[in-house]
């Protein structure tokens, strides 16, 4: 009888952690009220869990991308890397296309770096509810649903088209996510996406995703 051999994934990349994080200041204990933070408990719990995972991965460098220069960096780092003492490289995204940021992510990867953690900061649609910051637009929930669906399928091609497919979604994270995907692609990392949490109690989509490596 032939013995079954269990195959284990071998990661030859120097990327040891990668995640998508939302960045609403309201989830910070110093900003959000206890009542508001209860409404985003799933998001907070998910980020705290990934913070423990990042610590165990022992990265020497963090590359974080964000469309905002203040809370866009500070909120994810509070939960994911509060005690991190290594190098943090911040990458600010602008208005160029998601595909351009995907290519930029490829160029940003440096194989000579040792142990890298990637964080893509960004919120999903801001128009999920009538009482949300931009009211309701049907593009909002469609964008969020398709982004999650394509992430699960590792369908980068369609992810990079989402800004054109749903132009009224009022999202702020797609270019940041595209940058992370470009770095992952260039690194050769063997990654498997997991949606850790998703919710939108205030009319804005908050996604926490773990790219298992």
Locate predicted features.
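Beta-strand elements within well-structured catalytic alpha/beta cores of enzymes
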Residues: 62-66, 114-122
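Short, active-site-adjacent cap segments at secondary-structure transitions
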Residues: 125-128
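Flexible, D/E/H-enriched segments
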Residues: 5-61, 67-111, 130-213
